[in-house]
Curated annotation (Swiss-Prot):
It is found in: Cytoplasm. The gene is pcp. Gene3D superfamilies: Peptidase C15, pyroglutamyl peptidase I-like (3.40.630.20). Belongs to the peptidase C15 family. Keywords: Cytoplasm, Hydrolase, Protease, Thiol protease. It holds the Pfam family Peptidase_C15. It comes from Clostridium perfringens (strain 13 / Type A). GO terms for biological process: proteolysis. The keyword Cell inner membrane does not apply. Homotetramer. It comes from the Bacteria. GO terms for molecular function: pyroglutamyl-peptidase activity. Removes 5-oxoproline from various penultimate amino acid residues except L-proline. This is Pyrrolidone-carboxylate peptidase. It catalyses: Release of an N-terminal pyroglutamyl group from a polypeptide, the second amino acid generally not being Pro.
Length: 213
């Protein structure tokens, strides 16, 4: 099995992106699966183009994209991506699409086909704070998740794909009072455990993972 895992470069004035740094730290072989790592730009369209180029090159079985979600307390596999770009800030090339469909011929939303609840359970069972997230936002993270799942539905039908958001690391919150963070080693371990769960679970488990609001 080949797993392509991507991480964004820093954005929004940050000098580091824990998503990318954690991706760099994970093993290149997990439960017999080959892990291929890819840095992508925090830029609308270009991020997707780079992922599709890599898909064409290596023909992966799984594509997982990792992004930073400052303010979250744990590692959060995403359930769904919506067909909407609505950028609160500019991307790294100054683009700021507002209320724009990602693909005009795409569905309103696509759901991850990764075993997200099994991933959360694997992390929690090993001491990593984790939960299912039901919103990937409307910035480049959602753009990438939606775009990859669009490609999976239209073109690469045998690929399993999804997205994981990770918290800030402590160095990023020194001047952000009362903002949660997680050690980079724990984030990397969470990603490794998530890949383990993907390799070992063709189908997701049935367990509570929803939210009241």
């Amino acid at each position: 099995m080949k797993v392509l895992i991507t991480g964004f470069d820093p954005f929004g004035g940050e000098s580091i992106n824990p998503a990318l740094e954690a991706v760099k730290m994970i093993p290149e072989n997990i439960e017999g699966a080959q892990v291929i790592k890819l840095e992508i730009p925090t830029v609308f369209r270009k991020s997707l183009e780079k992922i599709e180029e890599k898909i064409e090159e290596i023909n992966p079985d799984v594509v997982i994209s990792i992004g930073q979600a400052g303010g979250r307390f744990g590692v959060t596999p995403e359930r769904v991506a919506i067909n909407m770009d609505d950028a609160r800030i500019e991307d790294n090339e100054g683009n700021q699409p507002i209320d724009i469909s990602i693909y005009e011929d795409g569905e309103s939303a696509y759901f991850s086909n990764l075993p997200i609840k099994a991933m959360v359970k694997e992390m929690v069972d090993n001491g990593i704070p984790a939960s299912v997230s039901n919103t990937a936002g409307t910035f480049v993270c959602n753009h990438v998740m939606y775009g990859v799942l669009y490609l999976v539905n239209k073109k690469y039908k045998n690929i399993r794909a999804g997205f994981i958001h990770v918290p800030y690391i402590p160095a990023q919150v020194v001047n952000k009072p009362n903002t949660p963070s997680m050690a980079i080693n724990d984030i990397a371990k969470g990603l490794e455990l998530s890949i383990k769960a993907i390799v070992l679970n063709d189908n997701d488990i049935k367990t509570v993972g929803g939210a009241v609001c």
